[in-house]
């Protein structure tokens, strides 16, 4: 089901796809610090037009752990892109050199365009404000590993839910499971209407809240994204809102004992650092699982 497929949108993958990916990732966990030879002789090209730490590094480590090689660039500086080379021409060049291409771009649809011109599979490493499918796969995989299932979970999403592309892809991925989602944000930072309409049409149960303390006692998972300061005209309004959506140790006193807190990272100040020492913190394990998850993804796409 996976071999040779592009990974452009979370909407393209169903439950069976995800379950196969998760089972393969769990196998890969045993080898996430070893070196295998599954992809020996294969080359992954990375075309990252935007900054990235975890996505880029986990893809690189994953490919090397599988025995493959990595080429590419991280930012346009020092490349022909800086001279004005188009995305299409850049992708065609990378396609000639590699077996799979990972693209990260600020413009929505960049990965889809790359897939249309490349013969090799293309993986969306994050584009525009609404797509980051492999992060969503990692987020749901972390839930699956923590609880043994995703079905039946109460999942809270808190912060700037409109402008975080991880949120959009996560909601789309969660439509494959029987979960209830609590959207916790100011009304003007809720996900865009198109996303809400789509996930509800797929049967995802949503409820809307402005205060996390009203619902924290019901949650199994709390997924935190930062409030994006650059979206506010009034700095005072930003400071007011930011403080209302910050996770603290005191806030967790009413949480379920098994609640896990996830974050796609990087964290700014939306989670108090003292939360790191609580049994609820799972965001660093979540980031670490990015290697076996992406090992599984590359293996399934490139397997002979």
UniProtKB/Swiss-Prot annotation:
Any one GO BP annotation for this protein: amino acid metabolic process
Entries under Pfam families matching the protein: OTCace, OTCace_N
EC nos: 2.1.3.2
A molecular function GO annotation: aspartate carbamoyltransferase activity
EC category name: transferase
InterPro entries: Asp/Orn_carbamoyltranf_P-bd (IPR006132), Asp/Orn_carbamoylTrfase (IPR006130), Asp/Orn_carbamoylTrfase_sf (IPR036901), Asp_carbamoyltransf (IPR002082), Asp_carbamoyltransf_Asp/Orn-bd (IPR006131)
Ligand binding (L-aspartate): 83, 165, 226
HAMAP family, alphabetized: Asp_carb_tr
Subunit structure, as described in the record: Heterooligomer of catalytic and regulatory chains.
Similarity annotation: Belongs to the aspartate/ornithine carbamoyltransferase superfamily. ATCase family.
Protein task: Catalyzes the condensation of carbamoyl phosphate and aspartate to form carbamoyl aspartate and inorganic phosphate, the committed step in the de novo pyrimidine nucleotide biosynthesis pathway.
Protein name: Aspartate carbamoyltransferase catalytic subunit
Species for this entry: Pyrobaculum neutrophilum (strain DSM 2338 / JCM 9278 / NBRC 100436 / V24Sta) (Thermoproteus neutrophilus)
């Amino acid at each position: 089901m996976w071999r040779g497929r592009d990974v452009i949108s979370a909407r393209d993958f169903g439950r069976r796809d995800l379950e196969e990916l998760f089972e393969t990732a769990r196998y890969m966990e045993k080898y996430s610090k070893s070196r295998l030879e599954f992809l020996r002789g294969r080359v992954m090209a990375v075309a990252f037009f935007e900054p990235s730490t975890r996505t880029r590094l986990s893809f690189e480590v994953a490919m090397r752990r599988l025995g493959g090689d990595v080429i590419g660039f991280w930012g346009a500086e020092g490349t022909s892109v800086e001279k004005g080379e188009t995305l299409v021409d850049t992708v065609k060049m990378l396609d000639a050199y590699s077996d799979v291409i990972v693209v990260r771009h600020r413009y929505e649809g960049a990965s889809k365009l790359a897939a249309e011109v490349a013969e090799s599979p293309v993986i969306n490493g994050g584009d525009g404000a609404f797509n980051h499918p492999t992060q969503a796969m990692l987020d749901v995989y972390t839930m699956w590993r923590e609880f043994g299932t995703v079905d039946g979970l109460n999942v809270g999403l808190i912060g700037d839910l409109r402008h975080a592309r991880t949120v959009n892809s996560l909601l789309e991925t969660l439509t494959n499971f029987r979960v209830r989602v609590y959207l916790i944000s100011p009304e003007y930072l809720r996900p865009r209407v198109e996303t809400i309409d789509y996930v509800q049409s797929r049967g995802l149960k949503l409820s809307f809240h402005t205060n996390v303390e009203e619902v924290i006692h019901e949650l199994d998972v709390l997924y935190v994204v930062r409030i994006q300061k650059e979206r506010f005209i009034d700095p005072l309004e930003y400071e007011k809102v930011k403080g209302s959506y910050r996770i603290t140790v005191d806030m967790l006193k009413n949480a379920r004992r098994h609640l896990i807190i996830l974050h796609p990272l990087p964290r700014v100040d939306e989670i108090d650092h003292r939360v790191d020492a609580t049994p609820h913190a799972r965001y660093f394990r979540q980031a670490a699982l990015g290697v076996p998850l992406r090992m599984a993804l590359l293996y399934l796409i490139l397997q002979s």
